[in-house]
Amino acid sequence: MNAEFPMLNTTLCYLEQGGKWLMLHRVTKKNDMNHDKWIGVGGKFEPFESPEDCLLREVREETGLTLTNYRLRGIVTFLLGSLTEYMFLHTADGWTGELVKDAARNEGVLEWVPKSEVEALPVWEGDKIFFRLLKEDRPFFSLKLKYEGDDLTEAVLDLSLIHI
């Protein structure tokens, strides 16, 4: 790995139930790039994990649920200064166990949010693009999002530039 240009691998999952997504309101950590944003559940890969291993572990840690039906929807590449993050984006509609609402207390607060209301919440501009793709049930996609600070400056979907 090039220390000058680090890479990060993460997973993110939106659990779906009754027209709602389970979302995490990131309000706990003060020095958090996602502070006060609403995102799905997920996190960073640990050594030797596959995307699926990371997905299952992160969802279990942050919700108390064990996924039984999930789908890889796309890969989102974030360009954040010199950092490149590859995020494996999933949705899930099957699980076992009971939701532990305070399982993610170190990260924030879990809430079921109607899909129609998500874009009105404090979310990253690029997330609005993949929310639309998820709602349209778009087949597997590759989305590249370039940020300068908090500002989305470029979005490329399946190698086509999107006007933002």
Show where each model-derived region lies.
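Conserved N-terminal beta-strand and adjoining loop/helix that marks the start
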Residues: 1-23, 44
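Short, charged/polar surface micro-motifs in flexible loops or helix N-caps
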Residues: 16-20, 29-30, 46, 92-98, ...
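A conserved beta-turn-beta hairpin within the catalytic core of GNAT-like acetyltransferases
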Residues: 31-36
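Unchanged
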Residues: 45-68, 78-133, 153-160
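Low-complexity, intrinsically disordered Gly/Pro/Thr-rich segments
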Residues: 139-148
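Conserved small/polar residues in nucleotide/adenosyl-binding loops
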Residues: 162-164
